[in-house]
Structures are given as structure tokens and as C-alpha cells.
């Protein structure tokens, strides 16, 4: 199914589970490289799964990170020659197609992938995890008033405060929100939505329980 303007898709897999847009991106990048023989990097925004990094590394490619906003994805794709780029909110495009998001094209490419591989979506995801490893994402949204937003901005972006986190920190980026990169490969980002009065927390860790725990620490 697509959204109203058909620039994003929603997918239910063969087991009846909703396929997260992160997984759609991972599946299509894996398909383009492994089965279609394409070569090139991938582009994702700062809040999108690092499974793309793992798949890229597996095939000797690179993953580029950009701020949230599809214009940044498109620009980086043109700059680097990336073969696919997208965001965890559901938009993606492929090299040689349009520079904007296209849900119908993405759906057609998924169907092509199923036909070419002869496998179900869940089976291909299992193959990816077996080859590239697995990480778990937790997402939280928090509503706020304008007064609360100003206070949170001060704490996160000006004072650069962080909660007590259980993993050793590699570095912190303020490219778009406050993103902590852990030495174990995990990460967590706190950023304000550009379209809704929400503070969004995304965390991805090797362990699902720890990802949920880290999100809770931001409360």
C-alpha cells in the first residue's frame, strides 16, 4: 500500500508482520548489490538503521550519513554515485530513477526481488542477518509544549547534556539533533520532528532490551 501521494509504501511480509521502512531499504540495497550485481555506496539519514552500514561493509561498499530531509539524501547520492538512498520514514529512490521519493517504484522493485530470488521477504531478511549480523531498533515519540521544547533544546543542544548511558561512548554528533555513537556499534539520537510537536528518540543496539532501556533513560 502507498500513502496519499504514493511516495512511500507500507508492506506486510509473508508472516503477517509489518515491514519497517528501515528493512525495506536494507532488503533493496542487499538485492541490488548481491543479485543485480550493482556496485556503489548507500545513503541514509541520521535516524535510519545502521544495518545499511553492515550490508555495505559486507560487500566492500560505504554508507553515507546525512541530516533528515530527502533533499540531503538526493544530493549525497548525486555526489557519491550511491545506488540507493532513503529514510526510516519510508522514502527511498534508486540511482538512475528520479531524485525524489517514489513508492510505486519501490514496490515494483520489491516484487522483482521476490521473483528473482524465489524467496519470501522473511527468508531474505534471515539471509541478511546471517551474513551481516543483526541489530535492534527502539523508537519513542514524546509530545511537548513550546515552553518544554525550548527547555529541551537548551539541555540537549546548548548544554549538551546526556543521560546516564550504559555503554562506552565513541563520539557525539550534533549534525541534526543529538546523536550518540557507542563503541559497540550502537547509537541513540534525540531530535525534534520537523513536521509535528514531537521529540523523537531512536536507538539501535545489538540487544533489543538494552535499546529499550537506553530510550527510557532519556525520559
Residue ranges and their predicted role:
Residues 38-219:
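Phosphate-binding and adjacent anionic-ligand microenvironments
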Amino acid at each position: 500500500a502507498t500513502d496519499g501521494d504514493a511516495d512511500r509504501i507500507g508492506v506486510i511480509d509473508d508472516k503477517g508482520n509489518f515491514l519497517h521502512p528501515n528493512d525495506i531499504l536494507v532488503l533493496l540495497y542487499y538485492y541490488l548489490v548481491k543479485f543485480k550485481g550493482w556496485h556503489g555506496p548507500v545513503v541514509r539519514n541520521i535516524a535510519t538503521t545502521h544495518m545499511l552500514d553492515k550490508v555495505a561493509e559486507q560487500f566492500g561498499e560505504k554508507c553515507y550519513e546525512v541530516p533528515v530531509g530527502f533533499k540531503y539524501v538526493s544530493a549525497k547520492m548525486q555526489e557519491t554515485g550511491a545506488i540507493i538512498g532513503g529514510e526510516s520514514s519510508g522514502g527511498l529512490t534508486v540511482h538512475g530513477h528520479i531524485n525524489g521519493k517514489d513508492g510505486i517504484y519501490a514496490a515494483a522493485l520489491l516484487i522483482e526481488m521476490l521473483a528473482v530470488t524465489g524467496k519470501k521477504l522473511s527468508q531474505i531478511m534471515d539471509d541478511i542477518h546471517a551474513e551481516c549480523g543483526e541489530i535492534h531498533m527502539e523508537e519513542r515519540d514524546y509530545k511537548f509544549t513550546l515552553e518544554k521544547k525550548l527547555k529541551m533544546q537548551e539541555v540537549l543542544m546548548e548544554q549538551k547534556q546526556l543521560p546516564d548511558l550504559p555503554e562506552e561512548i565513541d563520539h557525539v554528533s550534533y549534525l541534526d539533533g543529538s546523536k550518540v555513537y557507542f563503541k559497540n556499534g550502537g547509537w541513540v539520537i534525540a531530535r525534534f520532528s520537523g513536521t509535528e510537536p514531537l521529540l523523537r528518540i531512536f536507538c539501535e543496539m545489538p540487544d533489543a532490551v538494552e535499546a529499550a532501556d537506553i530510550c527510557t533513560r532519556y525520559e
